[in-house]
Amino acid sequence: MARVTMLVDTSKCTACRGCQVACKQWWDLPASKTTQTGSYENPRDLEPNTLTRITFHEYESGGKLQWLFLAWGCVHCAQAACVDVCPTYALKQNDQGFVSFERDLCNGCGYCTQVCPFNVPRLETINALTGEAKASKCTFCQDRVTNGLQPACVKTCTTGALQWSERDALLTKAKARVDWLKGRGYAQAQLYGENELGGLGRLFVLTAPPAAYGLPEKPEYPVLANVWQNLLQPFGYVAAGLTAVGLVVNWFATRRAQLANVETIVPGKEE
């Protein structure tokens, strides 16, 4: 099955935040209580109830100050560390290439929040008494795209800053857009996400270096995820297996001891 991808063309984004609203509306997420912090960003970060948001960045180049806007959320890495460390398989690579999330399977361990190179997943405490928690992240509206629809944010974008299609088609379009921008004076225009971490599910056409948007120049698969995948997780399976074997052996040993201690009573015989 062809991999589907989102293209974020920052040169077309007007920071209207329609994508933020559409996301909350589709997922029936409540508004967040915020305070004025001196920035146009609202809220200031991703939250359990804010899966998509527009980031604002001031960038100075050639003596000129520019506003850079970015539609931000999960980038759906092909080499997704969050998927590799999830012990309950709540996070999976969908056949269409994006990272799906099943909230009902999440045990709130928070491993995904520790290994994401882009610091995307958020952990929400559901029950303070029991400590129950659940993770959250953008799923590309998995219920929509698996039924042939666009993500809600893409559907509502009026400028074409957000686009949705097969990955190869969007890569071709994004590269052509970068060339067009360079021909119009955007010397630092570039494509971000083609090869990073196996290829991101959210491609970006940038008009400035990635760092200007708060993006890592060279995101890397985290060492912690490698340790978990290659050492701790296999050890956990072995430990679980040994525990199960031990319980079975213990049951038989206990049962044998119980049978050995049963007093044999011969009918008709009295002490």
What does each model-identified segment do?
Residues M1-E271:
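Non-ligating segments of multi-cofactor redox enzymes
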